[in-house]
Regions:
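Periplasmic-binding protein-like
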Residues: 297, 301-341, 388-389, 494-502
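Structural transition elements
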Residues: 196, 330-367, 383-388
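Ligand-site clamp/hinge motif
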Residues: 219-271, 403
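N-terminal lobe/hinge region of extracytoplasmic solute-binding protein
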Residues: 40-90, 121, 191
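Extracytoplasmic/peripheral linker and loop segments enriched in polar/acidic and small residues
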Residues: 352-355, 405-416, 445-514, 535
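Ligand/substrate-recognition segments at binding pockets and active sites
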Residues: 205-207, 245-246, 264, 330, ...
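Long beta-strand-rich cores associated with HINT superfamily self-processing modules
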Residues: 512-535
Length: 535
């Protein structure tokens, strides 16, 4: 029998009606202004620096106010964005980039090559693809105000792919003085050269974030395509409204009080599709992978046997069923990469084929020397995935005989706490859950969660020399078949040292009012340029 969120989340989320029809209270309509689009996103925006965090909501914020040198089009091919023209030397060691005319920051200063070099270097310190690229970079000289170079020590075919990555953190261009901030410290300023301006005066953190059209932004001449082409803003204002209660958000959407709802309750999608005033679609065709990250710095998950225990303890059907109900929008996946992608394989997946085995998990926890100390599970009560995932993680761990401290908080607080390296009893953590887009999860270079470079890496901080060797080998492989073979090696090793466990793969729907058009689908980011709204 499939577990539904109505059972497991009783008291954890607003009560929803039966799946026959959504329980949407008719609210007194207060439609938003014709050229203002009000959106409810998957989480509240708490961190404003899209390099410091990989949180998607912060990447959305970044895409509003910053721009990138290159952008992926709708076919996931890199295209110049802030760059006017570029070239590569015959020996494939020197890349030269020239910026477009008319690029300005919102403080009025021109965007210069020096700004871009500093931005690339700060981004590379936090990005998996950036770190891989910079290991092969000899120098990044500024030629003039509009021109700079990247000089390599050896040919590396992923330079342009890296600069155009859609995976968080994206390579956003900021002012040189902001880019010189320690990458492990947050930039507090929000001065960018993107299509929108962040309106701090009217923003109310925890309630609403306000973005106004940037009148000085010069879009490219090409049609918009994904993160590339002309980012033409057809609205005066976009607001991110923080409405944590799903039923309230649904009521507001149907009443026209909000215009766009990124992640409505997924078990009610079939009913929402029947509403003639709404458009309901999957915007990210690559889907998402849900995962539970394990902290390798502290017991019990500093022991590989305890991490392997989680493979046997996890039951993907529980989490996916709680979110999607009877919907067919998800699948169980045992691959170290997103299922259905070129890197998918079944190497070292006996645990997945076997299914949940609590007895086996208990045995592995005992072998790991579990000492009875509480396992701190971070649960974001306002996040569609991190809420049920936290509840189930606590349930599974208790079934295996472990003591659990279920730490409830909002998503913004979780994003801050997951960066804490102190022991769990001192404000740290043992597990948290999140989502990664399929296109990112299948790329061991772009996804920083595939890195195993210890405390320099992503939250959880796994360390595994073989994984790092295989990632480099994958990046340098000249053919797809060679990369597939290396991916099998990587998966065999990955499910031995276990940086995280997979909670399922899914395709989530978004909903918006019929009078909103021009919505562009893209992994990792929801583009708000090109959107129009009629009365």
């Amino acid at each position: 029998m499939t577990t539904t969120r109505r059972g497991v989340l009783a008291g954890g989320l607003a009560a929803l009606a039966s799946t026959s029809s959504p329980a949407i209270i008719k609210a007194k309509a207060q439609p938003s202004a014709p050229r203002t689009l009000k959106a409810v996103m998957h989480a509240d925006l708490r961190v404003l620096d899209p390099i410091w965090t990989t949180a998607n909501i912060t990447a959305y914020h970044g895409a509003m106010i910053y721009d990138t040198l290159f952008g992926l089009d709708s076919d996931y091919k890199p295209q110049p964005q802030m760059v006017s023209k570029w070239g590569i030397s015959d020996d494939k060691l020197t890349y030269t980039f020239e910026l477009r005319d008319g690029l300005k920051f919102s403080d009025g200063a021109a965007v210069t090559a020096a700004d871009c070099v500093a931005s690339v270097r700060r981004w590379a310190a936090r990005s998996g693809s950036g770190q891989s690229m910079m290991r092969r970079v000899k120098d990044t000289p500024v030629v003039d105000d509009k021109t700079f170079r990247i000089v390599l020590t050896e040919p590396y075919g992923l330079v342009i792919d890296s600069l155009s990555t859609i995976s968080t953190s994206l390579c956003f261009m900021v002012r040189k003085k902001d880019a010189e901030t320690d990458p492990n410290q947050q930039v507090r300023e929000t001065i960018g050269s993107g299509p929108f301006l962040y309106n701090r005066e009217e923003t109310r953190p925890g309630n609403r974030h306000v973005y106004d059209r940037n009148p000085n932004y010069v879009p490219r001449a090409e049609p918009p395509s994904g993160m590339s082409g002309g980012k033409v803003v057809k609205l005066d204002r976009v607001t991110f409204e923080n409405i944590a209660d799903e039923q309230t958000a649904l009521s507001a959407l149907q009443a026209g009080e909000i215009d766009f709802y990124e992640v409505p309750p997924q078990d009610l999608v079939d009913d929402l599709k029947k509403d003639p005033k709404l458009t309901v679609q999957v915007l990210n065709k690559t889907g998402h992978v849900a995962l539970m990250r394990l902290n390798h710095l502290h017991p019990p998950f500093n022991n590989p046997d305890a991490r392997r225990a989680m493979l046997y303890l996890t039951k993907q059907e529980d989490v996916m069923g709680a979110i999607f109900g009877q919907s067919k929008s998800w699948q169980a996946c045992g691959s170290y990469f997103a299922c259905g992608t070129p890197m998918t394989n079944d190497e070292n997946t006996e645990w997945f084929k076997h299914g949940q085995d609590i007895a086996k998990a208990k045995e592995l926890f005992q072998k790991a020397g579990y000492d009875g100390k509480p396992v701190v599970v971070l649960q974001a009560t306002d996040h569609y995935l991190a809420n049920p995932a936290g509840l189930f993680a606590a349930q599974w761990l208790r079934q295996a005989g472990l003591n659990v401290d279920l730490a409830a908080m909002d998503w913004g607080a979780l994003l801050t706490r997951r960066a804490v390296k102190k022991p769990p009893a001192e404000g740290g953590w043992n597990t948290f859950s999140t989502t990664v887009t399929g296109i990112t999860f299948s790329d061991p270079i772009s996804f920083t969660g595939q890195a195993a470079n210890g405390e320099k890496g992503w939250f959880g901080w796994p360390s595994n020399e073989l994984q790092e060797t295989l990632r480099d080998k994958w990046a340098m492989a000249p053919t797809l078949d060679e990369r597939k073979a290396i991916a099998r090696e990587m998966q065999k090793n990955g499910w031995d040292y276990v940086p995280h466990v997979v909670l399922g793969q899914f395709f989530r729907n978004s909903a918006w009012r019929k009078n909103v058009t021009g919505v562009l689908g893209m992994p990792e980011v929801v583009p708000f340029w090109n959107m129009e709204k009629t009365a």
